[in-house]
Every structure is written in C-alpha cells, then in structure tokens.
C-alpha cells in the first residue's frame, strides 16, 4: 500500500477556542504553550474543498508527544472540512494523519476503496501538501495524508 510503515503521525482535534484548549493541554501535561498559527488563504495554499477553491482558514497549535503530534484546529466560519465537522460533531477528534511519499498514489488507492478527497491544499510554507479524505463511513475516522516535498540542498 502507499502508506509505507503505517505510522500514525498526528491526531487532529477540532476545537471552538484554541487558546482555552491549548492551555488545558499545557496544564494537564505540563508542556509549554505552542505558537498559534493561522493558515494562509487560497492564494498561498491553493486549497480546494469538495473540488472547489476554498478561502477558509483555521488557527492551529501543535503539541509533540513522542512520535505522535496533537493538532488543535479552530476553524473560521467559511465552509471547510474543519467548519463542517465542528458544526456536525462539536469539539472532538477530527482526523488521524499518515505521512505519505506520493499523495497521488495514496489518493488513487483509497479511491479504489470508495474513499474520496474532501479537502486538499499546500502547507503555508509550500513545503508539502495535506489531503483530507472522506474515510469516516468506512473507517470510523477521517484520514489526512501529509506529503513533505523534497527540499533543495
């Protein structure tokens, strides 16, 4: 399969208030507050949602716990995989993520299992791309694919 070593690298959580939730993680786990980042808009990320250009943004915070990263996501009000999920499910686990070397191959493989792309875009620094897939009906959770592009040396 295109999933390499099958290592889950990230668990994403949708939240209403990123500062409040991040502070709870800091208090409970005794870790430092990470910087809160805002995803860039379409002109940078080329994000599509359900196949259409998408201007939605989100505020993100990342906690590294060993080999697994916890991502907190506070969406803006624009339609997106993040906003729709928060509206439908409230604050909860949003996705599990895998690092892949070839997003196209992974997407084609999953399409063969009836799992289609929901949202896709470039990282804010354009060093890679993310892809959310409509896997919850089959797997009970949304999948995210993360591809880091080779960097010039």
State where each predicted segment sits.
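Vicinal oxygen chelate
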Residues: 1-2, 8-16, 60-68, 85-102, 104-153
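Catalytic phosphate/metal-binding cores of nucleic-acid and nucleotide-processing enzymes, i.e., regions
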Residues: 5
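Conserved short beta-strand elements that form part of the metal-binding/catalytic scaffold
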Residues: 32-84, 127-150
């Amino acid at each position: 399969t295109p999933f390499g070593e099958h290592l889950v690298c990230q668990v994403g959580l949708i939240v209403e208030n990123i500062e409040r939730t991040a502070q709870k993680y800091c208090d409970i786990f005794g870790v430092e507050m990470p910087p809160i980042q805002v995803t860039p808009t379409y002109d940078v990320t080329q994000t599509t949602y359900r196949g259409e250009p998408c201007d939605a943004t989100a505020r993100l915070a990342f906690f590294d716990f060993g080999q697994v990263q916890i991502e907190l996501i506070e969406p803006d009000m624009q339609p997106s995989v993040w906003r729709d999920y928060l509206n439908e499910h409230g604050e909860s686990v949003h996705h599990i993520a895998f690092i892949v070397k070839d997003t196209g191959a992974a997407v084609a493989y999953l399409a063969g299992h009836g799992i289609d792309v929901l949202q896709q875009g470039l990282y804010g620094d354009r060093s890679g791309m993310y892809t959310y897939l409509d896997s919850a009906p089959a797997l009970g959770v949304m999948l995210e694919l993360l591809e880091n592009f080779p960097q010039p040396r």
